[in-house]
């Protein structure tokens, strides 16, 4: 009986039009999006190129975390109509530990500020760890990171967040925490 139920779920899925959209400044989020597309056989596009977003039943949005925001997410998801009939999955990609509860709460609160209430309440949210290569940052991002680093490096240890610690540990380095196996839970959610 379980096999029939599983098959029924798969048959139901064939009528769902899904789209993976990503916002990536330096490439880590793009790598996750393309791998997710490869594994799920779902079309992928950048938020800058997305068209006809309302033709899809399921939107899977991956966005890099920059200065508390998810790159391109608010601009893209505000175009959605008929929210009650959409399935929305949001995946953030950042430097800090995606299993740290304080970090997760901070990210969720920032997402909540960026989205309309109905979109936020419908969204399933996941967090992935990305990477950074300071040598590839543009001038504005290098300056911002230096200012942030200087602001948090001398904080008492108990006042530093997981995000602060990750920035201090990786400052001025090239690090890559990309882990494609972390997509497995997201794929389970999609199917």
PLM feature segments, named:
Residues 1-85, 188-189:
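N-terminal beta1-alpha1-beta2 submodule of the flavodoxin-like/Rossmannoid cofactor-binding fold
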Residues 10, 58, 68-191:
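FMN-binding flavodoxin-like domain, especially the glycine-rich phosphate-binding loop
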